[in-house]
Each structure stands twice: as structure tokens, then as C-alpha cells.
A protein has these predicted regions:
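PLP-dependent amino-acid enzyme catalytic core
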Residues: 1-201
Length: 201
């Protein structure tokens, strides 16, 4: 999304991604005109490196989730859901760093306080779920997962941690077999190729 926005605004961008990022995602970023650089095995390593790089080179750093403007933008998804499905009583959202679910649930729960918000994470990388259980941001090593868009940890002091604690009613942890099954279901029954992170929810 950031790469697309930079292309639309004519802004030159540099996007850092973990080493294990899918080639499809990397190519999509490159096709938007941004330079892509790889660093680290985990999202937190990549974020910390990117933040330091931006500071040292006098660049603007944009977090993929730990930013109120980013979360507000993702809240428009919550608006669309409630606009199209005003009577829905449950919303499930894939969770990595927590930006998307923070944005969606902030608006959705404002519209309907009785709404159930379910955070969905791959069992192999459920850092937010385990951190909320422990009531602190944990530094947990993630296992490989088909859901690379939600993989990795959460940076210390992330604003999404408190938001997720307040807004998520429960978590569902999804196995790798379930992720693959959901991906195949979308291909077979809906003729849609979705990314692993989407199939988690």
C-alpha cells in the first residue's frame, strides 16, 4: 500500500523487507517504482534496521503498523465492513504487528460495541497473541509460515499492543495445514489467488 501511494504521489521510496518475503510481494513493490532491500529474518529486525537507516540518512521512516496515521488509514476497512454489513456480529482479522486489526476494530467497535473481534495468527508466528497473554511484548522467535505478511515480532513500545489488548475479544491460532487448505479453497471454489496472510482470517 505504501509503495502504491508513493507511486501515485510521485515520491521516491525505499522499502526494507525480511529475507523470506515472497517474490510476488517483492515484485509488486518493485513494480510500484520503489527500491527493495532485504534485511533480517524477522519483521522486527527489518523494522529496527530501517528505522536506524532512515535516521542516519535523514529520511522519513514509515512503520507498517506502529503509526497512528497508518492505523487510521486501515480503519477505513472497518468503515467499509460496517457500511456493507451493518448487522454483522463478528469480524475476524489477520494479525501481525496489529495495525490492521487496530484500525478495523477501532471503527467497528465504535459503530457496534457488541461486535466480536477475532484476531487470527499463524501458530508458527503468534507473537501478539502470546504477548497479550503475558501482558507484555515478548521477544519470541517465529517459525517459518506461509503467512509471511503477518510473520515476525512486535517492536517494543508499539502503540498497537495496548490497542489490541483493548479491542480484540479473542485470538484464533491457525496451523500451516489450515493456511494451505484455505489457500486451496480460494483457488478451487472462488478462482482467487490470495496471499497466505489473507487465508489466516
Amino acid at each position: 500500500a505504501s509503495a502504491f501511494a508513493m507511486k501515485e504521489l510521485g515520491i521516491k521510496g525505499l522499502v526494507f523487507v525480511p529475507e523470506a518475503t515472497s517474490s510476488v510481494k517483492v515484485n509488486a513493490i518493485k513494480n510500484s517504482g520503489c527500491e527493495v532491500r532485504f534485511h533480517g529474518e524477522d519483521g522486527v529486525d527489518t523494522e529496527n534496521f530501517a528505522r536506524d537507516y532512515a535516521t542516519k540518512n535523514n529520511l522519513t521512516y514509515l512503520s507498517p503498523y506502529n503509526d497512528f496515521d497508518v492505523i487510521s488509514g486501515q480503519g477505513t476497512c472497518g468503515f467499509e465492513i460496517m457500511d456493507q454489513l451493518p448487522d454483522c456480529d463478528v469480524i475476524s482479522v489477520s494479525v501481525g504487528g496489529g495495525g490492521l486489526i487496530s484500525g478495523i476494530s477501532s471503527y467497528a467497535k465504535f459503530s457496534n460495541k457488541a461486535l466480536d473481534i477475532i484476531g487470527c495468527q499463524p501458530s508458527n508466528s503468534a507473537v501478539m497473541a502470546h504477548s497479550i497473554d503475558a501482558d507484555e511484548i515478548l521477544d519470541i522467535e517465529s517459525e517459518p509460515t506461509h503467512s509471511d505478511g503477518t510473520a515476525g515480532g512486535i517492536e517494543k513500545g508499539a502503540i498497537t499492543f495496548e490497542l489490541c489488548k483493548q479491542l480484540i475479544d479473542r485470538f484464533e491460532l491457525i496451523s500451516e495445514n489450515e493456511i494451505i487448505m484455505n489457500l486451496n479453497n480460494f483457488i478451487d471454489n472462488h478462482r482467487m489467488l490470495i496471499e497466505g496472510a489473507a487465508s489466516v482470517a
